[in-house]
């Protein structure tokens, strides 16, 4: 079996020749290309080269394009900081949503105007060209509530969920409408799966009921885009006390 066959067998609950292995080898691979973190995360050719080196040098069984969590928020003009040796992150002193009254600023936008989202799509095209049928290519997408937290700041967002949950949910909807079109374009690159990061679906952040009310329906609609395109859905969640049941109900993933 090659890596693609091995992973597909496991996802279909069949016995592969061995357990598929995927350690997270993303930003660290910039060192194999001689690039800074900033260059690796902003230049499609360099970024793709890093991911390709991960399969060449370590023979991992798939590639997940976790670049950083600030890809999608770029579409709304969030100012970012690109450190030399760590992942990009928002400049929280200049949040797009600076106050609870400003959630109305968040409207559906054209993802094609985002340099970072289009860079990610370029990376995916390069990886699919090189790896299709040999290694599964899995696109990483931050969920709508996570993207909104990049535009507001997590602590402020948490408080806003209590003070004006309707405003937050309305903004989540607008973000999600943008992400739907973005995910459709991602699926059209030929990727094998889309991995959604629904970080907030964990007990260390909020209750299960709050997650369902705030992001659950949006996550369902977003996953449906990939399902309709015939692309597998996966879920990433690095929180604590994760709500596996709620995420499975919403997104029907093949893997978590």
What are these regions (language model features)?
Residues 65-75, 139-146:
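Short, glycine/charge-rich beta-strand/loop segments that flank catalytic centers
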Residues 1-29, 35-38, 50, 61, ...:
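Active-site loop segments of alpha/beta catalytic cores
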Residues 37-69:
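Segments that shape or occlude catalytic/ligand-binding pockets
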């Amino acid at each position: 079996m090659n890596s693609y066959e091995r992973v597909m067998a496991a996802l279909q609950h069949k016995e592969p020749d061995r357990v598929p292995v995927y350690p997270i080898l993303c930003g660290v691979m910039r060192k194999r290309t001689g690039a800074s973190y900033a260059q690796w995360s902003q230049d499609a050719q360099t970024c793709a080269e890093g991911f390709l080196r991960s399969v060449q040098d370590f023979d991992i069984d798939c590639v997940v394009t976790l670049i950083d969590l600030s890809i999608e928020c770029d579409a709304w003009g969030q100012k970012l900081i690109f450190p030399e040796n760590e992942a990009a992150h928002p400049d929280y002193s200049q949040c797009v949503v600076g106050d609870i009254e400003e959630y109305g600023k968040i409207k559906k936008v054209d993802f094609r105007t985002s340099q970072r989202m289009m860079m990610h799509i370029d990376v995916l095209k390069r990886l699919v060209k090189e790896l299709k049928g040999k290694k599964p290519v899995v696109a990483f997408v931050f969920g709508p509530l996570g993207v909104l937290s990049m535009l507001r700041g997590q602590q402020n967002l948490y408080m806003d969920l209590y003070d004006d949950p309707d405003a937050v949910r309305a903004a989540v909807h607008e973000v999600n409408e943008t992400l739907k079109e973005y995910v459709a374009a991602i699926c059209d690159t030929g990727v094998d799966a889309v991995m959604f990061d629904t970080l907030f679906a964990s007990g260390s952040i909020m209750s299960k009921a709050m997650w369902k009310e705030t992001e659950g329906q949006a996550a369902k609609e977003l996953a449906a885009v990939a399902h309709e395109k015939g692309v597998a859905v996966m879920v990433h969640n690095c929180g604590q006390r994760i709500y596996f049941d709620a995420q499975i109900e919403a997104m029907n993933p093949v893997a978590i």
